Amino acid sequence: MREYLITLLISAALCYLITPIVRAQAIRFGAVAAIRDRDIHSVPTARWGGVAMWASMALTFAIVNHLPLVGKSFGHEAQGIFLASTAIVLLGMADDRFQLDALTKLAGQVFVAGILLIYGIQILWLPINGVITLPPSIGQLVTVLIVLVVINAVNFI
């Protein structure tokens, strides 16, 4: 249990320390949210907050990978999740900087979901009225759909 607490604290500290660096880089590269009538902020706001979170996750993985309990968690599936998160962060950075069109973003999101499927990560059952076990092909479609919905819900916020 102590290793998981250490992992949490390392990740939180790294994110706290990395955020100002990423913010400065976002401003430097022009990845800022312009002021609009519907927004609350009154000055341009730096984007790329996900980059700081991703960087803290990556550094935390590198630091705690050798701990006896936590290190055992980094298998094939964790590599897939890390690769997919890297791809979505890069897509988000490009979108924040260059305002990508909707079709390009959708293609990138489907690509990210495909990475998860390649690494064997998919929804196998749904807890609806008991448990519904899904055939692999339906599970893959549901996985892609849920990944797309979650990415766009987070991006909407």
Regions found by a protein language model. Give the residues of each.
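"…together with the soluble PPM/PP2C metallo-phosphatase catalytic core" -> "…together
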Residues: 1-157
